[in-house]
């Protein structure tokens, strides 16, 4: 699928997710829904949760929103509270070596969305979305979903 066609894909973001993304963008940063919520939406499923990735650093995210929780701030993750709901907002990052298979020994914050998507496990989870930009799918996750293939990013 060509990038032009991917840009024409429209997903319905929950109102609170849209508000978080727009608020971050209003402050001059990039922000996208990312990962499993994008995959599930493309498959017509209702996501269990919505994750957001951003070029804003954790302290910048905390300065934008009145209610946040330091969920995993050393890994760039802040939970933004919207009413009683929490949404994880994570800074673009490049992960160091994984010692336990799940948590990186070190992280380096980045300002590049593609660098952040590279660290994800599977191509079908390495997609990001926001209405004004459309779908960002540099690792052909849609094609893998259509072929019913689970492929690691980088393979």
Question: Could you describe each region identified by the protein language model?
Answer:
Residues 1-155:
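Catalytic cores of the polymerase beta-like nucleotidyltransferase superfamily
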């Amino acid at each position: 699928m060509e990038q032009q066609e991917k840009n024409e894909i429209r997903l319905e973001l929950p109102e609170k997710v849209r508000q978080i993304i727009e608020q971050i963008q209003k402050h001059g940063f990039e922000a996208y829904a990312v990962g499993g919520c994008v995959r599930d939406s493309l498959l017509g499923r209702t996501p269990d949760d919505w994750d957001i990735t951003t070029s804003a650093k954790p302290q910048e995210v905390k300065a934008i929103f009145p209610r946040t929780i330091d969920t995993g701030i050393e890994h760039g993750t802040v939970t933004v509270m919207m009413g009683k709901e929490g949404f994880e907002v994570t800074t673009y990052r490049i992960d160091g070596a994984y010692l336990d298979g799940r948590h990186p020994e070190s992280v380096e914050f980045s300002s590049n969305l593609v660098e952040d998507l590279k660290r994800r496990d599977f191509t079908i989870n390495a997609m990001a979305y926001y209405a004004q930009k459309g779908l960002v799918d540099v690792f052909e996750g849609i094609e893998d979903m259509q072929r019913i293939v689970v492929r690691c990013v980088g393979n």
